[in-house]
């Protein structure tokens, strides 16, 4: 009996069975149904790394509550452009998911997306002034028109009782609330999308690692494979390869040898969350409440108290608490970081490290935190929290991008970046948040860069069938924005 794939050649090979590969695969299956598709996942189940429901916070990132997307300028004003762009991107994802549900390509939307209001909550005069300014900057925009603001503790308590009950002191507080926020189980969504692929002639392989990738003289990518359990080796050739293996993408990008991948490094950041599955406590909270990151802390460290829906059950999550590990994946190796160092990236990585000593200091302080101090931090947002009701869980690894920079030599970049070869035969995704929430626009960008001719001349009708407002900014058209959000809300059964 053989365990390794016997397929010798494919039009498209996906490395990694997470939300990015699943999204791109579902798109390609509809715009180019004649292409052969093969997926390789190194674990025995899909979406078990960063896409897994407990490896991320499940926030449908649309900049409704994430304060780091709206930085304050020196004059006190708020820059809203990034928030608008992220919300536009999330609307594209909602449209694609809605299309997949409407066509019955995937199952009930309740399995992967639920309405959970998004809130921002701040304390102290400076922060409440900032939040009001942010609200005033966002509210006039069609994509944020439903947002509410309050500095009345009694109103905030109605929105989020656990945040206000037992709160001591008379200092000012403020909150915004967007009722249309969502909680997304990206692990389940990944399984739904890959299930659609498998039902439509794609070959899905589990427990298989891609150990090497090289460009052949036949202009095909030659991949070496290893089945982890049996130890069997194999090989496959592909016309197009997408490296969507999360933190594992950097190593394979480096092995591909494409010039566009040189100079990139990875900075792994681990994290933990508190999880509460006590139904009585979970029933008292229905929101994702985001605060502000501590001074010197990275954007992904913003504290938040979240309602989660996983496997049909409601629970609560608080965090994150940052940490450091040299693994690039939860299932990876402590050698991941040192083995990623190359002559082409050692200087950018060193320069980025020197420019981010504050981040290093922050991570060290987080690693040294006791469980008791972590509970105390949670009580800033849930004053009556009892640590005995909460379980500390390890989140997925986040590998932030380090890259060349003309001025500083190297920078640490938060967010995601698409890397493609000059001929469009291979693409990879590096980085993290907002990540999964914007998988659809990210994969659209990759399609446009790797297949510019087909994207422009052949695929527009199919793409607009999936995403009707593709190429249009919803925020510039209030009527279209309202209609689109109402349509996708109905299809996705969002209350």
Curated annotation (Swiss-Prot):
SUPFAM superfamilies according to UniProt: FAD/NAD(P)-binding domain
InterPro entries reported in the protein's UniProt record: FAD/NAD-bd_sf, MQO
Catalytic reaction list: (S)-malate + a quinone = a quinol + oxaloacetate
Pathway(s) the chain acts in: Carbohydrate metabolism; tricarboxylic acid cycle; oxaloacetate from (S)-malate (quinone route): step 1/1
Species of provenance: Renibacterium salmoninarum (strain ATCC 33209 / DSM 20767 / JCM 11484 / NBRC 15589 / NCIMB 2235)
Gene3D superfamilies in alphabetical order: D-Amino Acid Oxidase, subunit A, domain 2, FAD/NAD(P)-binding domain
EC number, UniProt record: 1.1.5.4
Similarity remark: Belongs to the MQO family.
First-level EC class: oxidoreductase
Keyword Membrane in record: no
Name recorded for this polypeptide: Probable malate:quinone oxidoreductase
Single biological process term from Gene Ontology: tricarboxylic acid cycle
Cofactor list: FAD
Keyword Oxidoreductase: yes
PANTHER family in UniProt: L-2-HYDROXYGLUTARATE DEHYDROGENASE, MITOCHONDRIAL
Cited Pfam families: Mqo
Alphabetical keyword list: FAD, Flavoprotein, Oxidoreductase, Tricarboxylic acid cycle
A single GO molecular function term of this UniProt record: 2-hydroxyglutarate dehydrogenase activity
């Amino acid at each position: 009996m053989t365990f390794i794939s016997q397929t010798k050649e494919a039009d498209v090979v996906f490395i990694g069975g997470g939300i990015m590969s699943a999204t791109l695969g579902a798109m390609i299956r509809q715009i180019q149904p004649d292409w052969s598709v093969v997926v390789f996942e190194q674990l025995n189940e899909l979406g078990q790394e960063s896409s897994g429901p407990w490896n991320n916070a499940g926030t449908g990132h649309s900049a409704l509550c994430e304060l780091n997307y709206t930085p304050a300028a020196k004059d006190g004003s708020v820059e809203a452009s990034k928030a608008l762009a992220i919300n536009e991107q999330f609307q594209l994802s909602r449209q694609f998911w809605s299309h997949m549900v409407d066509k019955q390509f995937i199952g009930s939307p309740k399995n992967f997306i639920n309405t959970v209001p998004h809130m921002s909550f701040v304390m102290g005069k400076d922060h409440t002034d900032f939040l009001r300014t942010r609200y005033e900057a966002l509210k006039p925009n069609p994509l944020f028109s439903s947002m509410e603001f309050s500095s009345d503790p009694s109103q905030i308590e109605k929105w989020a009782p656990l945040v206000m009950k037992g709160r001591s002191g008379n200092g000012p507080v403020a909150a915004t609330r967007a009722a249309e926020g969502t909680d997304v189980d990206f692990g389940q969504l990944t399984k739904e999308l890959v299930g659609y692929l498998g039902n439509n002639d794609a070959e899905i392989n589990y427990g298989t690692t891609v150990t090497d990738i090289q460009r052949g003289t036949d202009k095909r990518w030659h991949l070496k494979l290893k089945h982890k359990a049996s130890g069997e080796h194999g090989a496959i050739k592909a016309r197009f390869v997408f490296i969507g293996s999360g933190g594992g993408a950097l190593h394979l990008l480096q092995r591909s040898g494409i010039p566009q991948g040189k100079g990139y490094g990875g900075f792994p950041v681990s994290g933990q969350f508190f999880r509460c599955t006590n139904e009585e406590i979970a029933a008292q909270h229905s929101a994702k409440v985001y605060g502000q990151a501590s001074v010197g802390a990275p954007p992904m460290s913003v504290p938040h108290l979240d309602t989660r829906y996983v496997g049909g059950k409601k629970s609560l999550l608080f965090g994150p608490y940052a940490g450091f590990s040299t693994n690039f994946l939860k299932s990876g190796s402590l050698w991941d970081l040192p083995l990623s160092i190359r002559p082409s990236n050692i200087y950018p990585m060193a320069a980025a490290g020197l420019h981010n000593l504050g981040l290093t200091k922050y991570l060290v302080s987080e690693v040294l935190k006791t469980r008791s101090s972590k509970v105390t931090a949670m009580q800033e947002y849930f004053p009556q929290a009892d640590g005995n009701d909460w379980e500390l869980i390890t989140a997925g690894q986040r590998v932030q991008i380090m890259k060349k920079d003309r001025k500083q030599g190297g920078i640490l970049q938060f967010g995601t970046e698409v890397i493609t070869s000059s001929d469009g035969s291979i693409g990879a995704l590096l980085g993290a948040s907002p990540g999964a929430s914007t998988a659809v626009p990210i994969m659209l960008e990759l399609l446009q860069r790797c297949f510019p001719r087909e994207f422009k001349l052949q695929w527009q009708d199919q793409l607009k069938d999936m995403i009707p407002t593709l190429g249009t900014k919803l925020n510039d058209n209030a009527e279209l924005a309202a209609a689109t959000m109402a349509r996708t809300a109905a299809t996705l059964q969002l209350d």
